[in-house]
């Protein structure tokens, strides 16, 4: 195991230093290295290359289950325990999301709505339930605020907007974008927290104009909107939350949301497929 680690890292660190740290002899390592590799070792080396390819493509965010699923989708047959072992040997560890942190603040003088969604985060079709919220990213020029609207069926980001200020128009822009790009009926449930951006007159008028069913979390209860909170935690781990400028942060968000997350990133809650694939499968089944 120690010699295997040295072999995998010999281009990154001096062999003699690693041998000293691991308390093995350099001569022993070179004798081990000179032996012909077994068929199993050859297979492990080829599989490790594929694993590293999947891991890099995921922005170093996939753990063993997602890596194993992606390998299977590529037609590579291997067991999950083997993937876990090779990832451990290569030091491949998925980034971990942090705890939720509340961004919006309730406006006590404005009317709110009941919690119609009531933590039912699994629905049977796209455009059945949307969830929205706001978070922020730090830049050297100041905060950049991000508002999103997610579809609960596919977990797709159907609308998003950014602003250097936390205003009512930010949330309004994200919802307007979602409504422009999606064809929705009057049976759509739209769920947010009780933040002032969501209880504002302009936002409520937009909901009313499209006859959406309004649902709001209980005051101060982030778990009532856990799906979008989880998305923000994932985004900040996979994308980062510190940028040189607001413009660069916005560009990074576009690439992450529109190119990676919506189209490629596997989501465990929808069977380890991407949001785009989840909706494509639904459309194909509906047309059959």
Region annotations inferred by a language model:
Residues 1-288:
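Charged DNA-binding/catalytic regions of mobile-element recombinases
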